[in-house]
Amino acid sequence: MRFLISSLLSGLALLTSLHAFVLALPREYTIAMSNPFHESLFSCPAASWPRVKLGSENTPQEPSKDLRKILSQISPKRIEATIRKLVSFGTRHTLSTQTNATYGIGAARDWIESEFQRYANASDGRLTVKVVGYDQQPDGNRIPFPVRISDVVATLKGEGDPERVYVVSGHYDSRNSDPLDYKGIAPGANDDASGVAVSLELARVMSQRDLPRPKATIVFAAVAGEEQGLYGANFLAQSFRNSSTNVEGMFTNDIIGSSTADDGTKEPHVIRLFAQGIPPLNVENQAMRERRIMIGGDNDTPARQLARFVKETAENKHTDMEVSVIYRLDRYLRGGDHRPFLEAGYPAARFTEPNENYAHQHQDIRIDKDPKTGKDIQYGDLPEFCDFDFISRVGKVNAAALWNLAMSPGMPRNVRVNTNALSNDSKFSWDPPAGGNALVGGYEIVWRSTTAPFWTHKMDVGMVQEATIDLSKDNVIFGIRARGKNGERGVAVLPFP
């Protein structure tokens, strides 16, 4: 009994001491002790390491007065009218007739050209339009006979650095359940009249004579042959490559027509942006790829730097959209027109709606049973399933990204980090953008932790071409970007040793 009483007294004393210890702890620790899953048990003050007092927070870039004017004029009604007009051609299958004035892909091509030309006529010579193409021979797959592939291209030439080019496109061809059925109805409202509508609407708004010309050139394209094998986009990308055109960014808008999934889930203020990681081997050879992996640069490819730029400049109250950057080339089992541009060595990314309804893609028009519920549902890519306000907001995201890109000085070249000796600081050097320093107001070093998706810090280093920062290159990811004379940021570039 004496032993038991002694043990109880000792235990009570221990509990009293423990209670006093707990009371002395900071509040966040006492909360954690009462909750074994509290976040403070999985984090600590060192989680923000390396702690740096250099530079400043990298905040989003607000749209300029001119850009706000552009965004305010993007019209859901015009986008709807464009989509319904394209659907009215019955089918826009790449293999369909090109001689009928009201039916088939030829009629759609001619109408798109006429719309671009109408905007060009009102632009005081700023916008020019042409149809380019080639004869595609049978490929043993989805091209069973020779066919003309035509791309409709409208060019808003820049003033200041016109040799630097940005491209936005949608594909105007369509298909139904059978990829070789070129006679049956294939409305293609979402896939991809929605993307073509954005190209047309941006060309209309951005080419207006009461706006300043962009510094760089913007190309608005409607391409064919996507459903048969990305043929139109490949032709356009290779044409740019063959002429040594400096394309510093390309966006394809493909399936951007609806914010509603097959289960009714709605995300009307989110757009996905797909950005590839390691470039194709024909763009970066094996040695370059190994260097990229060695320095941890696999998440800092040109495509992903472009996506970061979009996130930073096009996600705001004026677009009313969140840009959800997806770090992969595309969705599973799918492909898009950004891929040929990537394979040509150009930074490119794909915009696609957040939720897809596969009953409204690549389907014959019919009422049939839903395999999940057994209920009758409407199949087919019809305008009634499009959200035209949503498409206009996606158009605003594109406009914000393109205008900011075209008004920026472009990307610095030959960006390097010095690794000649061991050191705890980081020394960088770079060359001006391809257009020189005429548009540059200064340069910035940006950085983030190796696990962060987007830039968190920046430091203005002025009009120099080399700089040293008291922060170890071993601990963060760095980028170098040019800043325009009015503060317009360019796309950051990863420094290589």
UniProtKB/Swiss-Prot annotation:
Keywords linked to the UniProt accession: Glycoprotein, Hydrolase, Metal-binding, Metalloprotease, Protease, Secreted, Signal, Zinc
SUPFAM superfamilies in the cross-refs: Fibronectin type III, Zn-dependent exopeptidases
CDD domains tied to this protein: FN3, M28_like
Major localization class: secreted
The Fibronectin type-III domain, residue ranges: 411-497
Superkingdom to which the source organism belongs: Eukaryota
Subcellular location(s) per record: Secreted
One family name in Pfam for this protein: Peptidase_M28
CC terms in the record's Gene Ontology section: extracellular region
Binding sites annotated in the UniProt record for Zn(2+) 2: D191, E227
InterPro entries assigned: FN3_dom, FN3_sf, M28_fam, Peptidase_M28
Similarity-based family: Belongs to the peptidase M28 family. M28B subfamily.
UniProt-recorded name of the protein: Probable zinc metalloprotease TRV_03476
Protein source organism: Trichophyton verrucosum (strain HKI 0517)
